[in-house]
Amino acid sequence: MNISETLNSANTQCNIDSMDNRLHTLFPKVTSVRNAAQQTMPDEKNLKDSANIIKSFFRKTIAAQSYSRMFSQGSNFKSLNIAIDAPSDAKASFKAIEHLDRLSKHYISEIREKLHPLSAEELNLLSLIINSDLIFRHQSNSDLSDKILNIKSFNKIQSEGICTKRNTYADDIKKIANHDFVFFGVEISNHQKKHPLNTKHHTVDFGANAYIIDHDSPYGYMTLTDHFDNAIPPVFYHEHQSFLDKFSEVNKEVSRYVHGSKGIIDVPIFNTKDMKLGLGLYLIDFIRKSEDQSFKEFCYGKNLAPVDLDRIINFVFQPEYHIPRMVSTENFKKVKIREISLEEAVTASNYEEINKQVTNKKIALQALFLSITNQKEDVALYILSNFEITRQDVISIKHELYDIEYLLSAHNSSCKVLEYFINKGLVDVNTKFKKTNSGDCMLDNAIKYENAEMIKLLLKYGATSDNKYI
């Protein structure tokens, strides 16, 4: 078996273990080692080829881990009876990637059988989509790049203890478990207009910066919608209203769930190789069902421009592309779509933008307040370490509903930030709230939220409570 076959074998671990055993047997018999008389240095091409084989292997291994987590833990896959068993040890099997390929083929076969045979105009549209180039758009308020773009999955961010705003929620993790993937919007790219063509995904503005890559991943997967929330929003939420003004009936038809034959949670999923074919076939299925004749004629027009094709695809669907674990590349483009607000910079821990905007103490106090209300411990400590904040400054911070003491002791608030405020005399541990929960104090909050660390901290600094029910 050659190196390439060995690295890509599903039994790679067995091969490695077997080799280890042979080496252990051999080592005691070795009495001396010397260089051969002639030693050929590997040329640059061989070194590069070897490096690419190793990189490809590690990329596949990481993808196997991400897919194994998704297909074994996501409750929706279990409900559909398409889940796989979790690995028996820490090593994920390449079978998880093979499972993706089988599911992709299943959804392609399902829609192909439904549509057979295709008309000439349908074949023309399908060919147009398959032969189109795609770009993938990730939006964020974070500063994700210098010379290299680095985007990490929510799971990797958590594992590294990075503090940032989350766009992954409990139900995503419970039902889909795709939190070890990086998410991208999908656009048609072979046109002369400036990228990105779209700045929202499923009605959501995910950030002021668009990071665009024009290369896919051999182990990525695509869904026609958000993988968890597979409902296409009503037409008035869509971004390009001037395009939609051309049509009437289809605007009433577009809001729907996109799913396979097993019900709403049966979300079609395609590997990278099949994704354009899947996108084209499902689009044809929608067009066939539509009663909007003008929309049909527009879609099947012989001179359909790439931008118009993108408008159609991101109206009928809103495709989402997913790359396992992490994207790290020098081949990207960063586009500033709009300005970033101070609150967005704070919640994204975007220190470059924070430093641009926080030019005096007044703005620093705003940033401090935003970091406390959004429970951004890292940014709060950063502001406190770079500005001399006084008790009078803290008193000047106003909130319509909450006292600063309440916010410092609210659910999931930072003990480090609270202790800094206490040590510097910026708050008194026994100050009673005047607004929400009037008459209570920080210790009452800590006890109510069962925050043992905060209770211990407040008692250490002499906190008391008059609440007889505690």
Swiss-Prot record:
The keyword Kinase is annotated on this UniProt entry: no
Top enzyme category: lyase
Primary location recorded for the protein, binned into one broad class: secreted
Record-listed NAD(+) binding positions: H138, Q139, S140, L144, I157, N167, F183, H201, F206, D226, E320
Pfam families: Shigella_OspC (PF06128)
Cited SUPFAM superfamilies: Ankyrin repeat
InterPro entries associated with the record: Ankyrin_rpt-contain_sf (IPR036770), OspC1-4 (IPR010366)
Superkingdom as given in the UniProt entry: Bacteria
Residues at the site labelled Important for catalytic activity: H138, F183, F206, D226
GO molecular function ontology, one term from the record: calmodulin binding
Role noted for this protein: ADP-riboxanase effector that mediates arginine ADP-riboxanation of host caspases. ADP-riboxanation of host apoptotic caspases (CASP3, CASP8 and CASP9) prevents their activation, thereby inhibiting host cell extrinsic and intrinsic apoptosis. Does not catalyze ADP-riboxanation of host CASP4/CASP11. Independently of its ADP-riboxanase activity, acts as an inhibitor of calcium signaling by inhibiting host calmodulin, preventing activation of the JAK-STAT signaling pathway in response to interferon-beta.
Family from the record: Belongs to the OspC family.
Name assigned to this protein: Arginine ADP-riboxanase OspC1
Species: Shigella flexneri
